[in-house]
Amino acid sequence: MKSTPSLYQWVVIAPKNDNTFLQAEQMLKDKKCVGIKIHPYCHKYSIEEYGDKIFSFAQKHRAIVQIHPGKEVDSIVRFANAYPNATYIMAHLGGENYINAIKNAKYGNVYSDTSGMASMKNMIVEYAVSQIGSERILFGTDTYSAASQRGRIEFAIISQQDKENIFLHNAKKLFKL
């Protein structure tokens, strides 16, 4: 990481392996590690089953957790409200259930990002901004295709300030850059 100063990383937690938390503890001490990434589908576990273990750890470290919630979007709200000192980014702005999760988080600690195909749906970015504002939407924190995502925001029918929030200001604030 020292040879690439502009590159930041996530530490992946696979909660079925207790050693994952030891590794995460060490990696979170590095300023280049921006938070924790979980992917329940790929690691074959349920957020409901392992959420307390993961999010209590995240709260203890005041960590940002990037989540691929799949069908468990509603679970995120419960955990975000139970562990308010952690911050939650649901990858791939997905639609109404994501927007409702962000609205229903009591502490304003749930965000989404614009990565992936879901945010390419017609007018989803505009709809999300109209429902929750631009302050809890991040530009592609989990994308492999920044160019297509960038165009999606640049040409969205939202204010210049909303675009700047999504592209820059929200990440700077959240990741303390």
Which residue ranges define each predicted feature?
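Active-site gating/metal-coordination segments in enzymes
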Residues: 1-64
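Small/polar glycine-rich anion-binding or flexible loop at a beta-alpha turn
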Residues: 119, 142-146
